[in-house]
Curated annotation (Swiss-Prot):
InterPro entries: NERD. It comes from the Bacteria. It holds the Pfam family NERD. Residues 29-146 form the NERD domain. This is Uncharacterized protein pXO1-01/BXA0003/GBAA_pXO1_0003. It comes from Bacillus anthracis. Keywords: Plasmid.
Length: 212
């Protein structure tokens, strides 16, 4: 009898716990990926590259957008969307959604360049000018980029560990030092630190993509 009661209590505890874990795993994985990329970007020369992480800003439409990483330099503004995924990745530059395959199971996710398009537009609206932006979709090395067709010169899909090399490969000066400082400090001031706003943004994304 005591064993049965113990098992019932264990089930009562584990079922809601499993639900909580499933709900938060994507968020935890996303944060872990962002930390790895943060470490990679810290290798850039701080005298030449100004790096911002986990930036949330308002858009011209009054909603908010969360940007994983922004690197600002005289060679351009690098906007990085991180994906802490595993398995095989398939996608194309213009497709609305990309595919992740793990064994026989397939799932789709939003095209990271579509996400970055909104991020870039928000930054340009904030700065009030068009900027030399480079859009980057960075994936964890544990995944395999199987068939990903991206041909635009200023768009890159790559692994985390290739970020530094790719950013440093840009050598043509596009911005003055004063412009770099202005962009960096403007974004820094506009960054929303209110946790309630950030939670609302996460909830908005969850509801939006749950309907798709």
């Amino acid at each position: 009898m005591e064993v049965l009661i113990f098992e019932l209590i264990l089930i009562a505890v584990l079922i809601p716990l499993n639900s909580v874990v499933k709900k938060h795993v994507p968020k935890w994985k996303g944060k872990a990926g962002e930390k790895l990329v943060k470490r990679m970007l810290s290798k850039l020369d701080p005298k030449s590259y100004y790096v911002l992480h986990n930036v949330t800003v308002y858009t011209e439409y009054g909603d908010t957008t969360q940007i994983d990483h922004i690197v600002i330099a005289e060679t351009g503004v690098f906007v990085v969307e991180t994906k802490n995924y595993e398995g095989w990745i398939y996608g194309s530059e213009k497709a609305a959604r990309w595919t992740q395959g793990i064994f026989r199971k397939k799932s789709s996710f939003q095209n990271p360049f579509h996400q970055n398009y909104k991020h870039i537009k928000a930054i340009e609206w904030l700065i009030e000018q068009q900027l030399p932006c480079i859009s980057m979709a960075a994936f964890h090395p544990k995944c395999s980029l199987k068939r990903v067709n991206v041909h635009s010169k200023e768009k890159h899909v790559l692994y985390y560990n290739d970020l530094q090399k790719c950013i440093e490969s840009y050598t043509d000066v596009q911005l003055t030092n004063d412009e770099v400082q202005h962009i960096y400090h403007t974004i820094l001031r506009a960054n929303i630190m209110d946790k309630d706003i950030e939670k609302k943004h996460v909830k908005y994304l969850h509801n939006k993509f749950a309907k798709q």
